[in-house]
Amino acid sequence: MEGLEACIGQSHEVMTTPAAELAAFRARKVALITGISGQDGSYLAELLLSKGYKVHGIIRRSSSFNTARIEHLYSNPMTHNGDSSFSLHYGDMTDSSCLIKLISTIEPTEVYHLAAQSHVKVSFDLPEYTAEVDAVGTLRLLDAIHACRLTEKVRFYQASTSELYGKVQEIPQSEKTPFYPRSPYAVAKMYGYWIVVNYREAYKMFACNGILFNHESPRRGETFVTRKITRSVAKISLGQQESIELGNLSALRDWGHAREYVEAMWRILQHDAPDDFVIATGKQFSVREFCNLAFAEIGEVLEWEGEGVEEVGKNKDGIVRVKVSPKYYRPTEVETLLGNPEKAKKTLGWEAKVTVPELVKEMVASDIALMKANPMA
């Protein structure tokens, strides 16, 4: 298959590829990761390289460097030997021709689609862009695979989200729980979810959704609430900051560790048949409880006073460490998310092992080290 010529004139008929040809194709172990420079993409790249894959990643062109999370891989001579185990390519989920070109050139055996505008609150400010990237971008990537006649050969993973459940219809949420999205981000991801199902059913593509509940790590983006908390706690411990402003302290979430969740992504694509899975811990904590755990790591116990936007968290000396600001509330809040991971445990043999206290401990320690080395980080 050479260049774009192989992708022109593709019919919508379902092709049948001989088993021997499929086996030989998959034995190549070539992965393409969109969103490779993000939290999940960086952990997934590490995992796949450790399993002997050739890893290709798509990054967006930027005037500033945005590859900090994967710099250790890109500069590692072990991933830049003669067979080029790790490669990065410029691309964008809004550019169909670029995606077709990459798919036809790389011919991946597995595609992990992680790229997204993934900040829920930002999606209210940028609803059209969020839909363009998260919804239509997923379609573009699936259609690129189909256009390049790789529909039967490629295994496709779509990073779906617990935000699909939004105004939850049952607790806990499983693969059978009805969706009720409460943000432009969640609505866009719901389209992504169903277009994956559609391509699986229409073209017999090995296409899967991982409905991942919140997952964190020291590599989490600084604007997400968990990382915002641990960064602020680190700064407070070093005298660089006095307090932190947050939104809904009572919001309940099912938090896990991103490093474990990318293992689930890989297992989903190694399963015998394509399917959709909830990936979660099955345990729930509030934002307030996350704050308590984080401050405990620097020896401070918080006492909470007031309600709503008047609520504050004070240390034993009466110093206010946590304040509530209306600007961090979403127009439509998602009050509670709790996943039921039984299907993943039974079918994939996957279950979360890192507890939330362990996760918080790791994140706070990492941010303290970061702030000591670079107070302006």
UniProtKB/Swiss-Prot annotation:
GO terms for molecular function: GDP-mannose 4,6-dehydratase activity. GO terms for biological process: 'de novo' GDP-L-fucose biosynthetic process. NADP(+) binds at residues 35-40, 92-93, 114-118, 129, 189, 215, 220. It comes from the Eukaryota. It catalyses: GDP-alpha-D-mannose = GDP-4-dehydro-alpha-D-rhamnose + H2O. Belongs to the NAD(P)-dependent epimerase/dehydratase family. GDP-mannose 4,6-dehydratase subfamily. This is GDP-mannose 4,6 dehydratase 1.
